[in-house]
Amino acid sequence: MTGYKLSMTEARTAYNAGDYFAAYEDLMGMDLKESDEDLFKKSRLLGDLQKKNKEYQVFVKRKMYDLALDSLVSGVARYQDNLDEAKTLGIEEEYTKEGDALVQLLQDQYGVSVDDAVSMYRLNREQYSIKIDEIVETWRRNHINP
């Protein structure tokens, strides 16, 4: 089996198993045939959301709540930004499942709505950081030292 075929097989296997980020990593940097471009695009969109969820989990375990919140806010904003592309690629169901998981975490843990997350994501870096810090400080008061 050639390197290309092996990489494509590994990527398809990961994708079909629901490990979209691994599929994306398998395809990243490859000179893809046109017929394989859709798998790359699907893996990129779904993998991005999966990665944000994994980042969130890691940051929470490390008690890095500002970075955890940032992962959710950026993930939810990207979810909204790329929803039309996901529909075009025919992955709306999977994409919505991954995105809704981020939305639920953001709302349940930090009380931040989708609209607020998208608005925050559009702020300049300084304003964004200030907003993240404000939300985390409120969260800490309510969860760590109630």
Model-derived segments and spans:
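Canonical tetratricopeptide repeat
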Residues: 7, 40-42, 86
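Repeat-mediated protein-protein interaction surfaces in helical alpha-solenoids
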Residues: 21-39, 119
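TPR-repeat structural position
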Residues: 16-21, 65-66
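Hydrophobic membrane-insertion alpha-helices, especially the h-region
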Residues: 1-2
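Non-cytosolic head/periplasmic domains of membrane-anchored proteins
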Residues: 33-34, 49-146
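Conserved small-residue packing positions in alpha-helical repeats and bundles
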Residues: 7-15, 24, 44-59
